[in-house]
Structure formats: structure tokens, C-alpha cells
Swiss-Prot record:
Protein name as it appears in the record: Cytochrome b6-f complex subunit 4
Predominant place of localization: membrane
Entry-linked PANTHER family: CYTOCHROME B
Keywords: Electron transport, Membrane, Photosynthesis, Thylakoid, Transmembrane, Transmembrane helix, Transport
Compartmental location: Cellular thylakoid membrane
Lineage: Bacteria, Bacillati, Cyanobacteriota, Cyanophyceae, Nostocales
Function of the molecule: Component of the cytochrome b6-f complex, which mediates electron transfer between photosystem II (PSII) and photosystem I (PSI), cyclic electron flow around PSI, and state transitions.
Gene behind this protein: petD
Length: 160
């Protein structure tokens, strides 16, 4: 049985830390043996059972045989490459498209240097990183949805 240490709420230093939002839960159950012997094996066995059940209930389908004389009108990449495909498809110059794709990781590398004065972990207290993340997520979704549409409707997503 695990021994739990209760916090002394009459301690002025602890009260000052809690008032600043610096409190952490150091007083819960230890990871050994509770999580390592009981929780982790259940999660691993449950995940394995779910994977086996999905493999049995929905086996992989083999597609129709390839016909080299009948190609589709527009060949689309896999779903995770839709945003990159849309960048290359919508920009008129190939070099401009490659530079736009290269600017994405470079911009992500620069985010920690832009906000290096802010040491908080809470996303609500890190406005630059949160704004960059939300903007990047929305642009990626917009590009990904637009890549599945025809070129004339792809930039407006067919709304206008």
C-alpha cells in the first residue's frame, strides 16, 4: 500500500506558490508499482486486442488491377501530402512553390527564438507560439481540403 503525503496548506511558502499557480501534484500515488504493474499492461493488452479486432473485422482490401492505358484525370497524392500538393498546384512558378514549402520548417524553427523570453508552459500564457500554431493548423486544413477539390474551386473551397 502506498503512503501518501498530504500537503501542509498552512505553510506560507506553499500558499505563495499556489497563489502564483506554481503548484504541482507531488502528493499522488507513486508510479511503482501502481502504474507499471497494473495500468500499463491493461493498456497494452487493450491496444493489442483493438488492433487484432480491427484486422479481423476489416481486412485490407486489394484494389483493382492497374491498367496502364486508362489513367485517371487527376492523380492525387496520399492525404497527408495534400497541403504540399496544393501549394505546388496553386503557385504559378515551381521555384516559388519550392521556396514556399521550404519556408514552413524554417518558420517553425524560428518560433522558439521569437518567444525565448517567455518561459511559461501554459499555452494561454504564450501568445506568439499559440497564434503561430493556430494559424498554421488553419492554413494546413485549408490547403488540405482545397487539394481534394478541382483547381478552380480549390482556393475558395467552393464557397464563393
Amino acid at each position: 500500500m502506498a503512503t501518501q503525503k498530504k500537503p501542509d496548506l498552512s505553510d506560507p511558502q506553499l500558499r505563495a506558490k499556489l497563489a502564483k499557480g506554481m503548484g504541482h501534484n507531488y502528493y499522488g500515488e507513486p508510479a511503482w508499482p501502481n502504474d507499471l504493474l497494473y495500468v500499463f499492461p491493461i493498456v497494452i493488452m487493450g491496444s493489442f486486442a483493438a488492433i487484432v479486432a480491427l484486422a479481423v473485422l476489416d481486412p485490407a482490401m486489394t484494389g483493382e488491377p492497374a491498367n496502364p492505358f486508362a489513367t485517371p484525370l487527376e492523380i492525387l497524392p496520399e492525404w497527408y501530402l495534400y497541403p504540399v500538393f496544393q501549394i505546388l498546384r496553386s503557385l504559378p512558378n515551381k521555384l516559388l512553390g519550392v521556396l514556399a514549402m521550404a519556408s514552413v520548417p524554417l518558420g517553425l524553427i524560428l518560433v522558439p527564438f521569437i518567444e525565448n523570453v517567455n518561459k511559461f508552459q501554459n499555452p494561454f500564457r504564450r501568445p506568439v507560439a499559440t497564434t503561430v500554431f493556430l494559424f498554421g493548423t488553419l492554413v494546413t486544413l485549408w490547403l488540405g481540403i482545397g487539394a481534394a477539390l478541382p483547381l478552380d474551386k480549390s482556393l475558395t473551397l467552393g464557397l464563393f
